[in-house]
Amino acid sequence: METYMGHPRHVLICFVVFLSAGAWGLYWLPQRMLLDAGMTGGWGTVAQYVISLAVLLPIAIWRLLNGKQIGLRHWACGLLLGSGAVFYANSLLVTEVIRALVFFYLTPLWATLIETVFLKRRFGWSRVGTVALALAGVWIAIGTDVGIPVPIYLGDWFGLLAGFLIAAGAARTELEQPDGVFPLLFMVIVFGLIATIYQYPMLSSVIGEIPTLEIAVSSLPFLLGISLLFVLPTTAALFWSPSKIGTGVFGILILSELVVGVISAALLTDETFGWPQAVGATLIVVAGIAEVTSNSPRQQAPA
């Protein structure tokens, strides 16, 4: 009998999620670069989702004309995941990178709680151990810098809310089991764009008003590159995966983003990186490997 995590490409999917999330650990860098270039008020994030939607819209129209789904039945997944992704993206603009990461990376805890309460799934001590190990890694990596993780800045609250929304969206995706990547991706981008717009009033008072047309045009090549080569492919890989590997495994694997984020922030900003960050990052990686290997597909011999 096959276990729940019985997808034939379970380990490969986990590896792609781990790498994609790690790439998101560098996302703060282009976000800050856009802000420095004058794309204030979160308009750099808005532009990325406008470009992504412009790419996907012709495909959606073609699918409609050919009687195929464009994802309307998965609107709840799109609302949760798209809003969560944008809250995270904008959290990097209005707080320190390390603070945004710590509040976002309560995700494994949210994911396991959601699986337990809403999906009625029971876990053994292995899951308790991996979640505890991952959270311990988070605490060691950033606890010495931020102390008790209590939200103070707007970006702290954005990061906290982003983690919960993405965990909830992952659970919803696991329940709905979207047929194919495009329908879910299209809904995520649509609701992500909506989220960028309603967040603008909160961001304009902190990081400035709408940029000028000249600044927007000069930033367009950079925005096209981020949207087409980063936002679309990584969003597709990350948010499709919970339906194949489970919400809890997803929540732990995306901790690779924290590892990359902490190290890159230490190298490229004045934020510190010492033995706590090294030990914490190691614990997070170990937790991810343990979770994947303990849930990889295997066949039980007939009794």
Q: Would you name each region that the model predicts?
A:
Residues M39-S52, N90-T107, I152-L165, A216-L228, ...:
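Structural signature of hydrophobic alpha-helical transmembrane segments
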Residues L56, S126-D145, P276-N295:
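Hydrophobic transmembrane alpha-helices of multi-pass small-molecule transport proteins
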Residues V17, A21, G25-M33, L56, ...:
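Transmembrane alpha-helical segments that form core, pore/gating elements
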Residues F15, A47, L101-L106, T173-G192, ...:
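Helix-helix packing/entry segments at the starts of transmembrane helices
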Residues L12-S20, R63-F87, V131, L154-L161, ...:
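Loop-to-transmembrane-helix transition segments
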Residues L12-I13, D36-S83, W110-A111, F164-R172, ...:
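Transmembrane alpha-helices of multi-pass small-molecule transport proteins
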